[in-house]
A protein has these predicted regions:
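C-terminal structural segments of small proteins and small subunits
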Residues: 342-348
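Sequence/structural segment immediately N-terminal to covalent heme-attachment motifs in c-type
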Residues: 211, 337-341
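Residue-level recognition of secondary-structure-to-loop junctions
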Residues: 200, 336-337
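Extracellular beta-strand/loop-rich beta-sandwich domains predominantly from IgSF
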Residues: 329-334
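Alpha-helical transmembrane segments of integral membrane proteins, especially early/N-terminal helices
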Residues: 4-25, 53-55, 60
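Non-transmembrane, membrane-proximal soluble domains of secreted or membrane proteins
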Residues: 2, 22-44, 66-304, 313-315, ...
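Alpha-helical transmembrane segments
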Residues: 41-57
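Transmembrane alpha-helical segments in integral membrane proteins
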Residues: 55-71
Length: 360
């Protein structure tokens, strides 16, 4: 019996050493790039360190029992029963109970509270809105609004080593806000706002690290797999320059003044559909298009292209409005193009909100 314990113990020790070496030396997960991610990574590593000896003991006893007591094809009769408990079950119960208590306290209570804690006075607030099938990022302090489309993947820009508070919601179905590099994920729920706070700890962009992306992690419909956005973590100076560029871009987007006698039309979007699918205008003169987006909190725009092929291949529109969430009314002023048939659409919903512009 002592020999059995010695061999099984030696086997357990060998498996434990190998397992602990793998845990300590091999990176099983991508490196965390946020303070909360580092807390999560530390908790997982501790759980693995504590789990390896328990797992190794089960494997060692199982392997030794199979090898030691193998009888081939003809098992003997049952041996005599073993009576009494001995110390081993009590030691096993004490060790596993102690490990369980340790895990409940740390990382259970301490790490969990650190990860879910909210930053009451963050350096930056980003309002994140999910919709089928893209993301909208609003920086209320900087008056910046970025809305993605299937053909124009948005980029969320964050300053490194600054606390960021994400206020997350959805306008249609359940989505999930997940940035793999930050090791953080939370649902975007219609009608409510969920919050996570973190501090990015490393600069980088999606072009150099594919983990720096916002990915919807909740099956949300036909184009769920395409619901992604890029993330860039930059220095404080680069972030300030980006903010200035975005604000200048918004300030410079001004419509020309309509002239007397311009052709005037109105198109309405409601329930993510245009109220008309064909518009006719005269080739000469100016066109004033009023776009009325009546869908609350849903982003739309109106843009006209040379053709449907030009729109789907990334061509620039002849005219169009910026993407904005409703309810909102926009005015688009442009010179009528040459006679012909043109294609218009909502760039956010390019398969369901389309139509034809006939220029005569």
């Amino acid at each position: 019996m002592k020999r059995d314990f010695a061999i099984a113990g030696a086997l357990w020790l060998i498996i434990t050493v190998i397992g602990e070496a793998l845990v300590l030396l091999v990176e099983f997960y991508p490196a965390a790039q946020s303070d909360k991610g580092e807390e999560i990574e530390s908790a997982f590593r501790l759980l693995l360190i504590l789990a390896v000896p328990v797992f190794a003991l089960v494997v060692a006893v199982l392997l030794y029992s199979v090898m030691r007591h193998s009888t081939g094809d003809t098992p003997p009769e049952d041996g005599p029963a073993l009576h009494g408990r001995g110390l081993v079950p009590f030691i096993w119960l004490g060790v596993t109970s102690g490990l369980t208590l340790l895990i409940i306290i740390y990382p259970g209570l301490t790490s969990l509270s650190a990860v879910i804690s909210d930053e009451s006075n963050p350096d930056l607030v980003v309002e994140v809105t999910g919709f089928q099938w893209q993301w909208q990022f609003t920086y209320p302090q900087q008056d910046i609004n970025i809305i993605g489309t299937p053909d124009d993947i948005p980029e969320m820009v964050l300053p490194v080593e600054r606390s960021v508070r994400f206020e997350i919601t959805s306008v249609d179905v359940l989505h999930s806000f997940w940035v793999p590099a930050f090791l953080m994920k939370i649902d975007a729920v219609p009608g409510m706002t969920t919050i996570i706070s973190l501090r990015p700890t490393k600069t980088g962009t999606f072009l150099t690290d594919s983990m720096l992306r916002v990915q919807c992690a909740e099956l949300c419909g036909l184009r769920h797999s395409t619901m992604a956005a890029h993330v860039a973590v930059v220095t404080e100076q680069e972030f300030e320059e980006w903010v200035a560029d975005q604000q200048a871009l918004s300030a410079g987007a001004e419509q020309p003044t309509p002239v007397t006698g311009a052709q005037e039309f109105t198109i309405v979007s409601e329930d993510s559909l245009f109220d008309v699918d064909e518009i006719q205008v005269e080739a000469s003169g100016q066109v004033v298009m009023t776009f009325d987006n009546r869908d609350a909190a849903v982003p739309h725009n109106w843009a006209v292209y040379e053709s449907e092929e030009a729109a789907t291949s990334g061509g620039a529109p002849i005219a169009g409005s910026p993407i904005e969430s409703g309810p909102v009314t926009q005015t688009i002023v442009f010179d009528a193009p040459e006679p012909g048939t043109y294609f218009f659409r909502c760039d956010v919903h390019p398969t369901t909100m389309t139509g034809v512009l006939e220029v005569r």
